[in-house]
């Protein structure tokens, strides 16, 4: 079955229009500044084996839906890490290490972020400690170990692994490189988001003769979605409709936008969309997403 025929079978379960929508480029670029976005692209585009990932056209689906064009950004070959996450964690490692070979990098992860941090640490010859919960598969742990990381499994869920990471990092003076923000910890998540914004720079180079009408973004804690919104503010001369998609069982962005404030939700059953099964929006992404998203949509696991 082709990708576009699979997509044509997707159905949404919830749809919400943001009543507080107010896309303001200046406000967005105060949170994730233009200079930070530009620097991320300049650094990452200089890495060995860098190339823009493909923007693929879903011709069958666009014909079926009577739309001009539908594109999807194919991140499956990004630095051979098979995820856009390669842009974020590894870039943050490079920025926070500042050429110091004696520091130890640490992070908590459900998979792809840790893989990026491990890879970024290996590139720079840094020690790396990665904390994972008991729910993370051994195959994912094995990949992170293949990049030289010391993988530490913690009983409980992701929050338990993050708490242990913070505890051990404070005790051992390790540098945490986390993609989730909390009070007094916002710089590194912003660096991670700046890395993700490279995708929007590439898209702006790949679509040069037409305007983008809609951008559909997946969301877990919101970092990638907010980074792409900032990229839109930086690189596009128009504002497309922005739609955030989440698992039905973990719609923390939708519920927060509906409430007008961050709402922590209880996840009764983990979604098969593992990296998106998140119960709370991260602080920095929320500052961007709360007014910049037009619509929120959820999708049930049975349609994935």
Task: Describe the function of each predicted region.
Residues 1-304:
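PLP-dependent amino-acid enzyme catalytic core
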């Amino acid at each position: 079955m082709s990708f576009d025929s699979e997509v044509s079978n997707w159905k949404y379960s919830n749809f919400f229009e943001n009543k507080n929508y107010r896309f303001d480029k200046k406000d967005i670029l105060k949170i994730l500044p233009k200079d930070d976005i530009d620097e991320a692209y300049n650094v990452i585009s200089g890495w060995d084996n860098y190339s823009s990932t493909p923007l693929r056209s879903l011709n069958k689906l666009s014909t079926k839906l009577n739309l001009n064009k539908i594109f999807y950004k194919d991140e499956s070959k990004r630095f051979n890490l098979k995820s856009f996450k390669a842009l974020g964690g590894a870039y943050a490692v490079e920025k926070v290490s500042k050429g110091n070979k004696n520091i130890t990098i640490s992070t908590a992860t459900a998979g792809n972020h840790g893989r990026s941090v491990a890879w970024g640490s290996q590139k720079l010859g840094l020690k790396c400690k990665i904390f994972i919960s008991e729910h993370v598969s051994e195959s994912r742990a094995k990949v992170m170990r293949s990049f030289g990381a010391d993988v530490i499994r913690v009983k409980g869920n992701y929050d338990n692994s993050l708490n242990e990471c913070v505890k051990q990092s404070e005790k051992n003076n390790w540098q945490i490189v986390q993609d989730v923000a909390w009070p007094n910890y916002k710089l590194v998540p912003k660096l991670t988001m700046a890395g993700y914004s490279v995708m929007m720079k590439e898209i702006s180079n790949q679509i040069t003769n037409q305007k983008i009408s809609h951008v559909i973004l997946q969301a877990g804690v919101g970092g990638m979605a907010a980074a792409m919104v900032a990229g839109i503010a930086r690189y596009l001369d128009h504002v497309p409709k922005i739609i955030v998609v989440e698992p039905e069982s973990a719609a923390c962005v939708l519920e927060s936008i509906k409430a007008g404030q961050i709402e922590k939700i209880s996840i009764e059953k983990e979604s098969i969309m593992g990296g998106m099964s998140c119960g709370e929006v991260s602080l920095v992404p929320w500052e961007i997403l709360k007014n910049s998203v037009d619509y929120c949509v959820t999708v049930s696991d049975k349609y994935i």
